[in-house]
Amino acid sequence: MPRQLSAAAVLFASLAVILHDGSQMRAKAFPKTRDYSQPTAAATGQDIAKPVQQPANQAPHQTLAARLMDGHITFQTAATIKTPTTTPVTTKNTPTTSPIIYTLVTTQATSNNSHTAPPLTKVTVGPSLAPYSLPPTITPPAHTTGTSSSTVNHTTGNATQPSNQTTLPATLSIAPHKSTTGQKPVQPTHAPGTTAAAHNTTRTAAPASTVPGSTLAPQPSSIKTGIYQVLNGSRLCIKAEMGIQLIVQDKESVFSPRRYFNLDPNATQASGNCGTRNSNLLLNFQGGFVNLTFTKDEGSYYISEVGACLTVSDPETIYQGMKHAVVMFQTVVGHSFKCVSEQSLQLSAHLQLKTTNVQLQAFDFEDDHFGNVDECSSDYTIVLPVIGAIVVGLCLVGMGVYKIRLRCQSSGYQRI
């Protein structure tokens, strides 16, 4: 009986010692629930994973696994690192049909890192966890990945364990997801000097400015006389009083009908230039112009060149002509030339210029008045016949009177 009591006491003492030692080992193995925001790993890994700074809008998805090695527990962090895309698209992640399993071993993170490690998921390992049971699976929620230009390099290290240790790998099971990518339309790139889009442009060309044509008269009419002057500063250079008419013919035949255009002094502008030996008078009107060039030669001057242009509106036709090396209206320097009779000059086969009631002077002026008048010979040819006709008429009248008187005298002598 005493031996049985002593044996029972020894047995209870042994059980007490075994239970005491077991509770100490359990307390050492699981002292408390740790915050694994900075876990340490006892494994002798050769590769050190670089800490990755994740975007602020993404929550880390991590799983902790417990490794039992000779009574020591080594905690490893299995992290899922989402590599952002570098293309500007919006990606929506939904569950796919095939699971992807990553086995990552992350070694101890140093405290000298400048970035703040994101919080990790806490796992409490209790006595009820079986030695070879797998940790719970963390399934990341569906999220939307934004645009990012950074690239993350993953370094996965396989820890080398002693042969007498049993390793429980940390397994991260990512739930199947389906990736649906919606791309925004790419904007076209415009290269210099090229047009990316076709532009339908309707351009309306402005009508070309046309000079209103002149209206021709089928029959000649009285020509108005205008006064035209050209000044050299304040001094008078050219002064002309005359009427001008332009005559056009569509055909060179003498039987071709003529049409007439008279210059209106009120609608004509005079301009020109003055020189020591050459001066010109330019008369501009609606639908054309007339240009007269004066040349001074020793003690006389004359018109050496005549040009004209006329545009007809109905039908639209341009008549122009030029006469060079002519001597017209020649007179002495300081005198004015006067020609009342009509003078004609053929400028081209279809254009003729006619002047009437002309009195003009160029170069030397005294005050603003014409000098001594030199008349054209054509004026004399008109006056002489008139004078002759008058003389002849007077002679006829005298002879008639004389005959009448003779008859009267002869009749008186017969009565006596």
UniProtKB/Swiss-Prot annotation:
Pfam families, sorted: Lamp2-like_luminal
Subcellular localization: Cell surface; Lysosome membrane; Cytoplasmic vesicle membrane; Early endosome membrane
One of the GO biological process terms: establishment of protein localization to organelle
Signal peptide: 1-27
Glycan attachment residues as annotated in the record: 200, 291
Keywords: Adaptive immunity, Cytoplasmic vesicle, Disulfide bond, Endosome, Glycoprotein, Immunity, Lysosome, Membrane, Signal, Transmembrane, Transmembrane helix
Disulfide bridge map: 237-274, 339-376
GO annotations of cellular component type: cell surface; early endosome membrane; late endosome membrane; lysosomal membrane; plasma membrane
PROSITE patterns: LAMP_3 (PS51407)
Predominant location: other
Positions of transmembrane segments: 382-402
Domain of life: Eukaryota
Membrane topology: Single-pass type I membrane protein
Gene3D superfamilies in the record: 2.40.160.110
Stretch list, region Disordered: 135-217
Cytoplasmic side: 403-416
InterPro entries membership: Lamp2-like_luminal, Lysosome-assoc_membr_glycop
Self-association state and partner proteins as the record states: Monomer. Interacts with FURIN.
Annotated PANTHER family: LYSOSOME-ASSOCIATED MEMBRANE GLYCOPROTEIN, LYSOSOME-ASSOCIATED MEMBRANE GLYCOPROTEIN 3
Entry similarity comment: Belongs to the LAMP family.
UniProt function note: Lysosomal membrane glycoprotein which plays a role in the unfolded protein response (UPR) that contributes to protein degradation and cell survival during proteasomal dysfunction. Plays a role in the process of fusion of the lysosome with the autophagosome, thereby modulating the autophagic process. Promotes hepatocellular lipogenesis through activation of the PI3K/Akt pathway. May also play a role in dendritic cell function and in adaptive immunity.
Name listed for the protein in its UniProt record: Lysosome-associated membrane glycoprotein 3
